[in-house]
Amino acid sequence: MKERTIQPVNNGLNGNITIPGDKSISHRAVMFGAIAEGTTTIKGFLPGADCLSTISCFKEMGVDIVQDGDEVTVVGKGLEGLQEPKAVLDVGNSGTTIRLMSGILANTPFFSCVQGDASIAKRPMKRVTNPLKQMGANIDGREEGTFTPLTVRGGDLKAIEYTSPVASAQVKSAILLAGLRAEGVTAVTEPHISRDHTERMLEAFGVKVTREGKTVKLAGGQKLTATDVQVPGDVSSAAFFLVAGAIIPNSKLVLENVGMNPTRTGIIDVLEKMGATFTVEPINEGASEPAANITIETSSLKGIEIGGDIIPRLIDEIPVIALAATQAEGITVIKDAHELKVKETNRIDTVVAELTKLGARIEATDDGMIIYGKSALKGNTVNSYGDHRIGMMLAIAGCIAEGKTIIEDAEAVGVSYPTFFEELQKLAK
């Protein structure tokens, strides 16, 4: 279990940083390229552990994939060309891989077994397996398909109109991907609109997708045609440096090529409401996935209330938003964020426990947390518990804490941001 020592940053973080490729888009580009007809070239791919798990699984199903750093070439097999895997499909730590791939496996007439690491074994799969079973897929797993390992025997599916109890892009995507080979029109309705990378990318691959309010529909029988994908930087990774730039004294950062998909930019809205000083300069207007350069500098923040429709737009950024709130004047309330409990860790409990160790005044609620600012943080030994976003949040906290902060299980950051610590060190010089 590797640990990292973080020293206080006395002279601020300064400089330009190119944010690594978006994890959600990288996963989808590989998957959609695999089931498309023709060769897909991906630039800006995130070579983190999660996305490499996706490549590994599709290679196991006979897809020819060549990865060289952040460039990937996928020779598509078409919707009907995947081969039955001879080995168990191992998704590692990747919830996106297992949930989206389940939708593809559900419509493919062969047998497969899917598993992941200890964290994946605790994450709820029934939200995906139930609708896929309703469509006609034969899926089993521990506790009637609630937990991995899962076995899937795909085949002829019928379209469904599904109302999801949760706003989850993974649930929505699994059903839509299954619907590509289902008879009829598949529709998914959500309580709030979740991230829409799947819909955008399906359209880029030539699939007609219809959006009506909180409902997304597609007709079965549509083919995907290979295309080139340019992956923008991951706003969820950018969030750590956006908050760092705002709360570390004497800082000014330029974050280049940050994905600005409106279903993902809740962090930008929150920082604006808290009073952060930043500018956003769009760089690729008209692209299916917009991006921008963002300049942010040390700011005086104030506490706010965060809840409702914005939560799906910033669910992965809540750990670092909580850190920002410890440095804001007044009280910040985060609510309606039950989904935090079923991430890589229970992020409500983990954020509260680890920030409390550093001296923050923060308490857990059933659906979020209450943070009392402004707190002077003090260095301590903390733990990521294998959760990449907790690890990065604690590293930024260590930059403003008095004395050194030791992060246990720090290598978890490699899931989404392999060069995170090197970038942090470079900007602190």
From Swiss-Prot:
Keywords: Amino-acid biosynthesis, Aromatic amino acid biosynthesis, Cytoplasm, Transferase
Any GO BP: chorismate biosynthetic process
Family the entry assigns: Belongs to the EPSP synthase family.
Organism expressing this protein natively: Bacillus thuringiensis subsp. konkukian (strain 97-27)
Name of the protein this chain belongs to: 3-phosphoshikimate 1-carboxyvinyltransferase
Pathway stated in the Swiss-Prot or TrEMBL entry: Metabolic intermediate biosynthesis; chorismate biosynthesis; chorismate from D-erythrose 4-phosphate and phosphoenolpyruvate: step 6/7
Chief place of localization: cytoplasm
Location within or outside the cell: Cytoplasm
Active site: D316 (proton acceptor)
Molecular-function GO terms, alphabetical: 3-phosphoshikimate 1-carboxyvinyltransferase activity
A GO cellular-component term linked to this record: cytoplasm
EC nos: 2.5.1.19
Residues that, per the record, bind phosphoenolpyruvate: K23, G95, R123, Q170, R347, R389
